[in-house]
């Protein structure tokens, strides 16, 4: 568990986020501090990432939910259940910086497979599906958790990717589910006034791609182009290696492709790097542990591999760490992964304590110094404890 030090500022206790000490005329960051208690050194401060524990569970167990942050809250919205029923929920759970859970206004439409991102003072929950119906709904929450709606997506779809660049949130790709899946290439951009603009589409149809931001670009990578009735991400043919970037004027360009085809991977930004981790390669039929990095000039390199090959993982950036948690690596109960890897700004990897339950289809959100990983599915064969309401908390 990470430790903290507080100092008094204007009669209030303020958490010290960073500490430095002078060595040879150079400021060196302090990673840990100890104090003597009863003749023993006790850790009182740590700037390193660690597992904090668990928070109050979600108000209802579910998978394929979406998470993001607005104001003083981490939000987890929507989600659903098994691939037969494909049932969606409208629940919105909110956690404050003390990890106290409240329930905010429900989504306007119950759905799973939706996408969420923060833009300015708004949290956007976009798209999704319920049964065989896809939605273009855009629910918007402000810092007081008041919900409004914005103009719908140009095409109703689920499993899209999101990224922010400049004053825009972009939603790219996805799939439209109306009894049969139709993969999409559409890209919709919303500005801070929540006005929608439809921009140049992806170079090809893609769902289960990953979106993130680096430098002055919103970047979308990989995904799956197959039109299919399948609901299992990444277990069919069709993964791709495209990388498409949009600048703050919404001009699109192609970047160096991924080193291999991947779908169901996850993206997180740390420092000047956008990390793309895990996924499934349909050409080799393998789950992936590789991690690719794009810098601000969109030059590609590689980072240390994940501790486990997997797709369907979640990611979050908290403090000076990008974390990748959970996932799935095969068709059995034992294939649900609990590993959590953290990368610092130097791309050094630390393997964290495991999630309390191995699972995929979980969502992430950050509040203060905490990264929360919530929900998911943990079994495929058994009907007991199949869906999860657990919220694992990591600190940095």
For each predicted feature, which ranges?
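Kelch-like beta-propeller repeat domains
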Residues: 2-8, 12-14, 21-25, 35-396
């Amino acid at each position: 568990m990470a430790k903290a030090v507080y100092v008094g500022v204007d009669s209030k206790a303020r958490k010290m986020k960073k500490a430095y000490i002078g060595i040879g005329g150079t400021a060196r960051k302090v990673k840990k501090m100890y104090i003597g208690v009863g003749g023993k050194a006790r850790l009182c401060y740590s700037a390193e990432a660690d597992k904090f524990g668990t928070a109050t569970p979600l108000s209802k167990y579910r998978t394929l939910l979406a998470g993001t942050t607005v104001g003083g809250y981490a939000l987890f919205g929507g989600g659903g259940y098994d691939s037969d029923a494909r049932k969606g929920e409208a629940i919105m759970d909110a956690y404050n910086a003390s990890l106290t859970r409240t329930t905010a206004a429900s989504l306007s439409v119950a759905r799973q497979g939706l996408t969420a991102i923060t833009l300015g003072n708004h949290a956007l929950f976009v798209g999704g599906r319920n049964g065989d119906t896809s939605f273009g709904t855009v629910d918007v929450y402000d810092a007081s958790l008041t919900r409004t709606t914005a103009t719908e997506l140009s095409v109703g779809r689920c499993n899209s990717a999101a990224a922010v660049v400049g004053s825009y949130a972009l939603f790219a790709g996805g799939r439209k589910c109306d009894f049969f899946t139709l993969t999409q290439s559409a890209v919709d951009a919303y500005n801070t006034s929540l006005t929608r603009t439809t921009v140049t589409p992806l170079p090809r149809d893609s769902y289960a791609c990953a979106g993130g931001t680096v430098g002055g670009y919103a970047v979308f990578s990989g995904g799956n182009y197959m039109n299919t009735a399948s609901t299992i991400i990444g277990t069919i043919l069709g993964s791709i290696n495209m990388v498409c970037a949009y600048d703050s004027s919404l001009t699109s360009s192609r970047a160096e492709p991924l080193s291999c085809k991947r779908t169901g991977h996850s993206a997180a930004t740390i420092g000047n790097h956008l990390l793309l981790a895990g996924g499934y390669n349909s050409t080799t039929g393998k789950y992936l542990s590789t991690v690719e990095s794009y810098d601000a000039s969109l030059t590609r390199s590689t980072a240390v591999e994940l501790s486990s090959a997997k797709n369907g993982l979640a990611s979050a950036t908290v403090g000076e760490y990008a974390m990748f948690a959970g996932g799935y690596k095969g068709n059995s109960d034992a294939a649900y992964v609990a590993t959590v890897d953290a990368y610092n700004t130097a791309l050094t990897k630390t393997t964290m304590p495991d999630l309390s339950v191995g699972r995929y289809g979980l969502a992430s959100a950050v509040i203060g110094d905490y990264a929360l990983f919530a929900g998911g599915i943990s079994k495929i064969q058994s009907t007991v404890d199949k869906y999860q309401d657990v919220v694992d908390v990591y600190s940095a």
